[in-house]
Amino acid sequence: PEAASEAASSEEAKELSTTDALRIAGLKGPTTMGLVNLLSMEEDGTASMDYDLQLYGAADEIVPLLMKGELDMAAIPANLAATLYQKTEGGIQAVAVNTLGVLYVVEKGGDTIQSMADLAGRTILSTGKGTTPEYVLRYLLNANGIDPDKDVTIEYYSEATEVTAQMANTEDAIAVLPQPYVTAAGLQDDTLRVALDLTEEWNKVADTQLITGVTVVRKEYAEEHPD
């Protein structure tokens, strides 16, 4: 009986811990790099609370979970955070900027891309359709007199790893990639080079800082946990 009681208490504690854990989601890539430290803190016992951190390949996997209240917090692209704020009428709010400029144009096997203008007539591989990478790329192309719908061909992939795989099989490939994928791809293929830093290109044409990722929280959770 005593053993059974201890087992029951242990199970209850486990359920309570799971229930009380802060449910966080992040995307594989730069928007979540700042959250990785939470895992090591939890493992070594220095975290101030329990965390349940889940990583996803695409932002559209996270959105419905936030909307249904199955997540408390998430690291997502900045433009998506703005959309969710509007859709939920403030029910999901940004609490911190976690990622600034981390996007680059990478070229394989050449040095033909020296400026945004050089992208005209080329095919560009990219992640992030409907999120920050797409909007940044389209904004910069337009700002440099290039129609993103007519003057270039943009092929979108759901994850950065798919872009790097496609680059490996494409001669003279050009891609928009975030860190740390730029570095990882370069280590696997020494013919890749960083052609353009999109933060630098942004600063040439915009008077605002390029913010690519933010951390959002459900308003209800924030009100229940003000600390």
Spell out what each predicted region is.
Residues I24-K28, G121-T132, N144, D149, ...:
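Short beta-strand->loop
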Residues A94-Q114, T208-K219:
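Hydrophobic/proline-rich hinge and linker segments of small-molecule sensing/allosteric domains
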Residues N79-L80, A160-D227:
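Pocket-lining segment of extracytoplasmic ligand-binding domains
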Residues P1-L16:
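Short, low-complexity, disordered segments immediately C-terminal to signal peptides
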Residues A21-L22, G26-E61, L65-M67, L84-K87, ...:
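Short, polar/charged alpha-helical segment
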Residues E15, K108-I124, K219-P226:
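Flexible hinge/capping segments at coil-to-helix
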Residues A13-P30, M49-L55, Q93, G121-S126, ...:
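Short, well-ordered beta-strand elements
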Residues L53-L65, P77-N79, P148-N169, P180:
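Short helix-initiation/N-cap motifs at beta->coil->alpha
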